[in-house]
């Protein structure tokens, strides 16, 4: 009887420890999730640790669109006047073209047209209804494309809106910094490149690229098996032997992607290169090429194990979703 009692007691204690372990693990996962903030890049959302340093480039018409100010009314005239002066002097950033004319657009937006030989350059200042100011520069516009280009800028001036950073754009919108555009999901080339230094992990960065493509390349796994490594994996492979942690297809919130994850030990430091990639559909903004990556700076990773690094990676990957 005593033996049976001791056995049952041991089982209960063991079960208690297991339950505590499960609850602790669940609590830690919940705590980790609560420390992630959702961000919006183009037609996707992704969650990253709070306090991470994030920088992103957004493109419409395959040209970078940059946030200038949330006080657009008070900044636009100064910005336009300064750009006109620089263009007239031939010292404008990014172009040797010389000022030719100013074209008023809708909603208070302004287009500056400059010229070098047979080609034109646009500097457009875009003002939203809620007073956010953006700038875009487009170069190498032919004389035949001039009027069509001006109409595209007019269309953009009527299709750009402000957005609180924590709010998703409305259905069909393309998220940019503090705003979004509504040019239509399949009409014009779009892309986003984001890089983030991860808070709490000084040796770790996350990058995210999404862009419309004209042709498909070999898949991530095909390139990996041919040893046609991308930069992050290639650097580790060139520095020493790499350990393959994962190489597999992976479905992420409806995105049929592929995943490769490797690690390497170099000069006593631990390095990781994790990649998730979707090949994309040709000439599609709603099903573009996608590349999500976790990499390690020269100082090495502070993750205590491969499992911890992969667990962090999985939280980021699982947060990746296409916007409606």
Where would I find each of the regions flagged by the language model?
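Bacterial N-terminal signal peptides
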Residues: 7-18
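Signal peptide processing junction and immediate N-terminal pro/mature segment
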Residues: 19-25
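Post-signal peptide N-terminal segment of secreted/secretory-pathway proteins
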Residues: 25-37, 49-135
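Surface-exposed amphipathic alpha-helical segments
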Residues: 52-53, 137-177, 292-324
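A short acidic-to-branched-hydrophobic micro-motif
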Residues: 54-94, 137, 190-231, 259, ...
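Signature of long, low-cysteine stretches enriched in small and polar/charged residues
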Residues: 86-130, 209, 215-284
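A short, solvent-exposed beta-edge/loop patch
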Residues: 121-141, 278-299
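Acidic, serine/threonine- and glycine-rich low-complexity intrinsically disordered segments
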Residues: 144-256
């Amino acid at each position: 009887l005593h033996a049976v009692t001791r056995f049952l007691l041991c089982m209960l204690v063991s079960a208690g420890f297991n339950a505590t372990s499960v609850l602790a693990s669940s609590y830690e996962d919940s705590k980790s999730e609560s420390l992630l903030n959702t961000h919006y890049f183009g037609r996707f959302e992704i969650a990253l640790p709070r306090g991470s340093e994030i920088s992103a480039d957004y493109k419409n018409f395959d040209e970078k669109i940059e946030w200038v100010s949330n006080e657009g009314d008070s900044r636009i005239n100064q910005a336009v006047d300064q750009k006109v002066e620089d263009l007239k002097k031939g010292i404008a950033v990014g172009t040797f073209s010389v000022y030719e004319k100013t074209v008023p657009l809708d909603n208070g937006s302004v287009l500056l047209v400059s010229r070098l030989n047979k080609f034109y350059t646009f500097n457009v200042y875009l003002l939203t209804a809620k007073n956010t100011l953006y700038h875009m520069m487009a170069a190498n516009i032919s004389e035949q494309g001039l009027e069509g280009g001006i109409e595209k800028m007019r269309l953009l001036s009527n299709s750009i809106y402000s957005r609180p950073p924590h709010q998703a754009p409305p259905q069909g919108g393309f998220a940019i910094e503090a705003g979004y555009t509504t040019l239509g999901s399949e009409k014009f080339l779009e892309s986003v490149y984001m890089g983030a230094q991860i808070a709490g992990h000084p040796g770790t960065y996350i990058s995210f690229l999404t862009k419309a493509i004209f042709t498909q390349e070999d898949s991530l796994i095909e390139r990996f098996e041919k040893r046609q490594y991308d930069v992050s994996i290639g650097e580790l492979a060139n520095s020493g032997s790499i350990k393959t942690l994962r190489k597999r297809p992976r479905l992420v919130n409806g995105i049929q992607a592929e995943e490769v994850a490797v690690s390497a030990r170099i000069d006593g430091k631990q390095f990781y290169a994790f990649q998730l990639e979707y090949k994309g559909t040709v000439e599609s903004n709603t099903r573009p090429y996608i590349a999500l990556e976790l990499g390690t700076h020269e100082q090495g990773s502070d993750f205590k194990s491969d499992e911890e690094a992969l667990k962090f990676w999985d939280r980021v990957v699982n947060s990746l979703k296409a916007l409606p």
